């Protein structure tokens, strides 16, 4: 990155999602421009909230060691497998339900518009039916999908498979 670009960039990052460290304060920012850096440090220190502590500092250091890189590679393999499984399962078993493979996230955005129309159901009906059989999903309306579900695929494959089998048997093909 050029020096000129560095003076106009602020990078905010964290190991929270990748390493499941959200309960620890580990976010940080990289700011080359001293005026912006001083201003950010002043503003962020006013509440004394989100200040890194000894435990979070060591968690951050551990996450960014070579073992953390290996773990991240394995995590990406598991998540990719879960995404492939979910997308294939939806395509083969949930007629009227469509999905696009996500890029860079483990959240699946599922379009149930055609299925709901064909079965006279609302997305709320689908959401409640999924929860009733132990498949934890989220209404996609807040993400501008009026008849969409949002599914978190960051779980062991066995849990993902069980949830999809339940949705198949008790929700989409009941």
Predicted feature locations:
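PLP-dependent class I/II
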Residues: 1-174
């Amino acid at each position: 990155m050029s020096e000129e670009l560095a003076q106009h960039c602020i990078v905010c990052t964290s190991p929270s999602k990748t390493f499941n460290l959200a309960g620890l304060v580990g976010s940080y920012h990289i700011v080359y421009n001293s005026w912006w850096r001083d201003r950010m440090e002043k503003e962020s220190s006013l509440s004394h909230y989100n200040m890194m502590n000894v435990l979070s500092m060591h968690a951050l250091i551990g996450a960014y060691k070579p073992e953390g890189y290996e773990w991240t590679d394995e995590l990406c393999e598991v998540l990719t497998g879960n995404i492939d499984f979910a997308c294939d399962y939806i395509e083969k078993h949930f007629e009227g339900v469509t999905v696009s493979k996500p890029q860079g996230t483990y959240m699946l955005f599922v379009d149930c518009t055609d299925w709901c129309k064909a079965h006279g159901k609302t997305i709320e009906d689908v959401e409640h039916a999924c929860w009733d059989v132990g498949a934890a999903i989220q209404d996609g309306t807040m993400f501008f999908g009026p008849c969409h579900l949002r599914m978190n695929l960051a779980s062991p494959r066995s849990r993902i498979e069980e949830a999809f089998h339940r949705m198949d048997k008790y929700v989409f093909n009941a």
